[in-house]
């Protein structure tokens, strides 16, 4: 897949000229190390480890099924605009008894109408993330019976890189668990030497929590994953609305808008609009898919399946997923897996 970028771009609507500048998005928006520098990242790692929360390691493989014919299933729910159109598919999986891992404000989006939420994960280091989760929502629905299934309050998976306000909010809660976002900055060496007698776990992956959650889910033991609201792009404006980067309101939105074009190896190409970190997530999704495949083939990772839900017309990750044959809709995989019709 080649991702081409046209800079600068008008907004709205997304625009790519007839002859776009063929520059790989990796060169324009390089892989990030997060929103804090190395010194602050490692300082937060130490503070997080000392916060007193239980380690996520104590939950590892708790969702593992010993029946290979029936792998445990999880729905990873992000906040992309396609989420609003995929509620029916999500409800179907929940009704079937499948579990849900929410990221960021999706926790509240799920609980407000009474949908299931078993896990909620946070990673972003900014202070406003402390307001992403309303703990009163979970408390008001401590045990619910939905679709014949009993389910318990969410478990909160908090990255050590989160802001101190986030740690303060969760550090005394028995249902909160600490993990570290691996970034290749020497964090493993620090944990091994300074916290040798303590439990800890590093989770590698993409820079956005929606994709890093795949590693979290795999560590918990899930072997079939459905991604909802993981788009990497915005939904263009309809006649009576504004463009949408999220399915719900967020108080802080990065408005570094870029127009970019995704070109699949099958020949399909389409323009999308996103901000920096969302655009980065598109190529991180492709890179992650290839990395997981290499690790599985090398015997370093247990096999798992992944399905992406979303409309490829405006969801860049859904389009890439369809081109790689992992879209939840078989017809989308068939469409984007072959050359587009000639016009």
Q: What kind of feature is each model-predicted range?
A:
Residues 1-343:
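Metal-ion/cofactor- or nucleotide/acyl-coenzyme-handling active-site neighborhoods
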